[in-house]
UniProtKB/Swiss-Prot annotation:
Catalytic activity: L-methionyl-tRNA(fMet) + (6R)-10-formyltetrahydrofolate = N-formyl-L-methionyl-tRNA(fMet) + (6S)-5,6,7,8-tetrahydrofolate + H(+)
PANTHER family (alphabetical): METHIONYL-TRNA FORMYLTRANSFERASE, METHIONYL-TRNA FORMYLTRANSFERASE, MITOCHONDRIAL
Annotated protein name in UniProt: Methionyl-tRNA formyltransferase
Stored InterPro entries: Fmt, Formyl_trans_C, Formyl_transf_N, Formyl_transf_N_sf, Formyl_transferase-like_C_sf, Met-tRNA-FMT_C, Met-tRNA-FMT_N
Organism taxonomic ancestry: Bacteria, Pseudomonadati, Pseudomonadota, Alphaproteobacteria, Candidatus Pelagibacterales
Positions contributing to (6S)-5,6,7,8-tetrahydrofolate binding: 112-115
Species per Swiss-Prot/TrEMBL record: Pelagibacter ubique (strain HTCC1062)
Entry's EC annotation: 2.1.2.9
């Protein structure tokens, strides 16, 4: 392949897509990713998954703090004479002036069915809002976040057993399987991009840790959505006797009682719509994850306990 493509991405989600492009032998003169971050204790520098892969492939990996007002990176990209730039969960806004630096523009792979769930956390928000399906949208990058015209949408079902981790994996694999045919169609001018319907747009704002706290007066289905949508991080949690408990996996139960009441020793907890959730896997603050059978052996949370943070 003689076409030159720059790839911009950061998390594991983006890795299979970069691998697909590399294995197709496109010329990839550079990869952009977020700068390495220090660990919490400051002893280790953690590179992004994309940086690790790019270095393994001996691709020039560039990690600017920002592209905005960054003349050096602008000039670098300009001199590459690019055909296309592909962006997958890069984590930075692409400045308007960059968008003319590639002959076929900047293409973004977004993890939602646009115009639904524009923004930073589409996978989490779709699960938390009890959507039955999600997917990926292949779109042109415009001046505003996730508003550009869409070329293709690919859908998958969200199963009851899914969480943000499993859906992320499924969508990443799906994108890696679909990217080559879309890139080739872009180069051959065979892919038609259609403007989004802004009136149908919803927004997937960044997840805040505080959102993970479970309100037991919510309905049981919404609580399950929160648990699944926030797994593995930051996680859904409750406070009992000043200790935090993260619920890693749960399912709908069949008991009802007072809001926040523990209905059985294996932690079936009553919710706000006369339904309950059954905890399957849980993690006590500072401890390792446990399945519920292990957890209840030494737990202070027993039948008749009341979790009152509603």
């Amino acid at each position: 392949m003689t076409k030159k493509i720059v790839f911009m991405g950061t998390p594991f989600f983006a890795v299979p897509i970069l691998k697909s492009l590399y294995e197709k032998n496109y010329i990839i003169p550079a990869v952009y990713t977020q700068p390495p971050k220090k660990s919490q204790r400051g002893q280790k520098i953690n590179k992004s998954p994309i940086q690790i892969v790019a270095e393994d492939y001996n691709i020039d990996c560039r990690t600017p703090d920002t592209l905005k007002t960054n003349k050096e990176e602008y000039e670098y990209l300009k001199q590459l004479d690019l055909d296309l730039v592909i962006v997958v969960a890069y984590g930075q806004i692409i400045p308007k002036e960059y968008l003319n630096l590639a002959k076929k523009g900047f293409i973004n792979i977004h993890a939602s069915l646009l115009p639904k769930w524009r923004g930073a956390a589409p996978i989490q928000r779709s699960i938390m809002n009890l959507e039955k399906e999600t997917g990926i949208s292949i779109m042109k990058i415009g001046e505003k976040l996730d508003t550009g015209p869409v070329g293709n949408i690919y859908r998958i079902k969200i199963k009851d057993s899914d969480n943000a981790e499993t859906i992320s994996t499924k969508l990443s694999i799906l994108a890696s399987e679909k990217i080559i045919e879309n890139v080739e169609n872009i180069f051959e001018d065979k892919l038609t991009f259609k403007e989004q319907d802004d009136t149908s747009a919803t927004y997937a704002s960044k997840i805040e840790k505080s959102e993970g706290e479970i309100k037991w007066n919510d309905n049981a289905e919404s609580i399950i959505g929160k648990i699944n949508g926030l797994y593995p991080s930051p996680g859904a949690f409750f406070i009992f006797k000043d200790e935090r408990y993260k619920i890693l996996k749960a399912e709908l139960g069949n008991k009802s009682g007072e809001i926040g009441e523990v209905m059985s020793n294996d932690l079936e907890i009553s919710c706000g719509n006369q339904k309950s959730i059954k905890i399957i896997e849980i993690q006590r603050q500072g401890k390792k994850p446990q399945n519920i059978n292990e957890f209840v052996l030494g737990s202070q949370i027993i039948k008749g306990s009341r979790i009152t943070n509603v």
